Structure formats: C-alpha cells, structure tokens
C-alpha cells in the first residue's frame, strides 16, 4: 500500500526512456496472471480490496478464464487475478545494454573499479579503490544489497538485509506461456523470455557470501513441473540478492549525516520495476 505512489510512476518512467531506444520486441504488453488453489476468495479478499481502493485495475478470473489465458497450465487452480496492463521483459540484459549505450551517447562516463570505501576532502566525497581516488561534488550510493558496507562506513545505521531469490531456465519452452504467471500459494513465478522459461522464487535470508542452496533449486524445478508437466533439463542455476528493509520500503534520498551523499537502494522484489523512476534521483 505504501509503495502505490511510486509504482504509479513506474510505467511512465519506462515509456520516457523507451522513446529513445529501439526495443525490437524486447518488451511485451500481455499482462501478468496470479493464480491460487483456494476454492473461495476469503484468504485473498484483503489484498483485492486494498488494490481496489487504490484504483489498481484488476480482473478476478475463474478457472475457465485462466485456461483461456494460459491453456498449457495444469488445472490445479481455482481462481486468480489478471493485471492486463502489465508488461514483461523478454531479455533484460539486452534492454540494459541499450540503455547503457544511450547513457554513453548522452555524455555519461563509465569507470569500472572496485570501490573500497568513501572518504572526504573539504566535505566533498572521494571514492577510494585499491589504486585510485575519484573526487565528486555529490554521489548516489546505488549498490543494492551491497550498499550496507558503504552506509556502515558512513556511520549511517540502516537495517538493510538481503532476500536471496533463486532462478532456473528451461530452454526453448517460452511458447508454453503467453505471459508471466505467479502461483501465489507456492511463492514462485514463471516468465516466457528469449532464453526460454525463467522460473524464479523463494525468499532466503542467507546473506551475501553463503553458497547457493541446492534444495531451493530443486523446489523451483518441481514447482515448474507441477504447473506445466514434463519439461526438458533445466539450465542456468543462479541466485540474486534482493535488497530489503524491515518495512519493505526503499531508501531514497539524502543521507542524514552528509549533505552531498544520496541513497537509492532497498527496492526488494521491485528493483527492475522501479529502476527508471528511482534513477531520477
């Protein structure tokens, strides 16, 4: 509910960026479908009502309507919600590379360095790497789950943690779904992409350094087959770090301790969604 205002700005911010790049089929506007296996809406009434009060366009769908939208899903479901206006990326990496090229074209400068800490000279921030120092008038710390190392260094006590989320791909299977589908009861989703079907899900508080938990990969594979039946051998096992705070709100704005340092991190499950509007900081 508290994220509604910034989420309302997400698609217009993307549209503004997309006016300047050739998407070439990299984004599809086919909506997103959430499904569940409860036989009534009682457990879903609160979230549906809150979205209704906020003016979110949502369509409650029954078994037949779900089957019409996604005929390849096994019929374990009893209902769901369809957000027809939603979009999804067919290849996020290609989109990011196009935006990166636009950044350089507009005069942006990219320097690849491993930054160790932030220091100051006459109240101006200095980014320190092993071998170099970079001087700025202002900086924005946007390092996702890795931002805490810098905020701790700046004596800014921010309770940032990481929700580890897992991913697997099933190659050449994207034709099985028309749009992203989230199975709410089991906490996972599947998106049709250029690389095939991307299956994502779970939340694991495992920090930034612990190894991948194999049982969670197996859980994703089992859930994908529960939804779609037989699938080929999976590939590309990996996990990502969702930067999250206890109140589930991102940190966006100036530091309390330093007038020329700004923060923009902690977008939990919505980093890709809120990237363009957050970038306006």
Predicted regions and their residues:
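C-terminal lid/capping helical subdomain adjacent to the catalytic/cofactor pocket in oxidative enzymes
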Residues: 5-6, 29, 60, 73, ...
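Rossmann-like flavin
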Residues: 1-95
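Active-site substrate-recognition segment that forms the wall
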Residues: 1, 117-120, 124, 133-260
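Helical element adjacent to the flavin cofactor pocket in flavoenzyme catalytic cores
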Residues: 42-54, 76-138
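Surface-exposed helix-capping loop/turn segments at secondary-structure junctions
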Residues: 16-28, 105-109, 156, 228-233
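General small-molecule cofactor/ligand-binding pocket signal
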Residues: 59-61, 109-111, 235
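Mid-domain beta-loop-alpha active-site segment that forms a flexible
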Residues: 86-101, 145-146, 216-223, 278
